[in-house]
């Protein structure tokens, strides 16, 4: 038996006609990318589910609402006029007064409404206005020289006229029947008369006519108020307000130009008017009125004391 030996050939060197099936590389890559994308989508969906399942544990900061009362700045900024309240805030008292006067001149109905609705001027506010006119008058005097000279008079003539005109305009407001309270009228007249006292006596006689006329008008105003005050409660406002002494003092400072007011006081209150006229004419200093004796506790000190049973 003859055995034939064949040479051994390794398998990888054999001529193998059976081939493995070929694969499409592009389809493989697209398949893998699709699987990867699906896995990512599934993972993100899980994260969303976990986030939505426990919102209380989320560290996210919620937006805060803007506090009330704060206005947001307008994004469409453009030029525009001021609102009326803001415009009025920028006006000075003089500008406001000039504006109102101009409007009232064009619209008389508005003028009447302002007069009827505006608050009544008080004594303090009115005297403050008069004090401003007086301060302007005093500031107009030139430096050096005599304050009563003709040169000084010419320098302050305009301010003097403004002061006297303001007195003429304000005084009737505090007279009856517009003012019903005698105490209010008397208090204003007291302050206004002191302003006239402080006016200078000019070297030229003709220049003093302004002051003389002011005294005459003020004396008439005093007489009117005294007459009305004497009708109310027996003139108690005059008796216990010390107005008899004040009127006598005004008459003394003015050189007797307030005599009309003194005469009205004498006629309206009788004995009190006599006491006032005597003191104004230069009565002895130890002559005291009954009211003064009562206030000082000396009433009846000069009368003899009664003796015996009562």
Swiss-Prot record:
Any GO BP annotation: nuclear protein quality control by the ubiquitin-proteasome system
UniProt subcellular location: Cytoplasm; Nucleus
Pfam families (UniProt xref): Cut8 (PF08559)
Biased composition (Polar residues): 14-33
Keywords noted in UniProt: Cytoplasm, Nucleus, Protein transport, Transport
Location of region: Disordered: 1-86
Compositional bias segments (type: Low complexity): 52-63
One annotated Gene Ontology cellular component of this protein: cytoplasm
UniProt keyword Transport, yes or no: yes
InterPro entries documented for this protein: Cut8/Sts1_fam, Cut8/Sts1_sf
An example Gene Ontology molecular-function term: proteasome binding
Subunit text: Binds the proteasome.
Family indicated by similarity: Belongs to the cut8/STS1 family.
Protein's job: Involved in ubiquitin-mediated protein degradation. Regulatory factor in the ubiquitin/proteasome pathway that controls the turnover of proteasome substrates. Targets proteasomes to the nucleus and facilitates the degradation of nuclear proteins.
Protein name in the entry: Tethering factor for nuclear proteasome sts1
Gene coding for it: sts1
């Amino acid at each position: 038996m003859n055995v034939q030996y064949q040479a051994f050939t390794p398998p990888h060197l054999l001529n193998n006609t059976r081939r493995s099936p070929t694969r499409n590389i592009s389809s493989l890559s697209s398949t893998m990318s699709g699987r990867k994308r699906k896995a990512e989508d599934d993972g993100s969906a899980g994260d969303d589910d976990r986030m939505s399942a426990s919102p209380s544990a989320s560290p996210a900061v919620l937006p805060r609402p803007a506090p009330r009362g704060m206005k947001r700045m307008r994004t469409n900024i453009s030029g525009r006029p001021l609102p009326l309240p803001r415009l009025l805030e920028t006006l000075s008292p003089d500008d406001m007064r000039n504006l109102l006067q101009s409007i009232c001149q064009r619209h008389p109905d508005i003028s009447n409404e302002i007069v009827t609705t505006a608050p009544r001027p008080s004594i303090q506010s009115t005297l403050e206005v008069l004090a401003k006119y007086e301060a302007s008058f005093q500031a107009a005097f030139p430096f050096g020289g005599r304050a009563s000279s003709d040169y000084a008079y010419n320098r302050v003539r305009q301010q003097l006229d403004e002061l006297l005109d303001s007195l003429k305009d304000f005084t009737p407001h505090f007279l009856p029947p517009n003012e019903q309270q005698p105490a209010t009228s008397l208090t204003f007249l007291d302050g206004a008369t002191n302003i006239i006292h402080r006016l200078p006596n000019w070297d030229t006689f003709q220049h003093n006519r302004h002051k003389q006329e002011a005294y005459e008008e003020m004396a008439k105003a005093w007489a009117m108020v005294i007459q009305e005050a004497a009708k109310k409660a027996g003139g108690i406002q005059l008796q216990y307000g010390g107005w008899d002494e004040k009127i006598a003092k005004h008459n003394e400072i003015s050189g007797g130009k307030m005599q009309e007011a003194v005469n009205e006081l004498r006629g309206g209150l009788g004995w009190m008017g006599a006491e006032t006229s005597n003191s104004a004419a230069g009565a002895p200093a130890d002559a005291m009125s009954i009211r003064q004796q009562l206030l000082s506790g000396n009433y009846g000190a000069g009368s003899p004391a009664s003796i015996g049973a009562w």
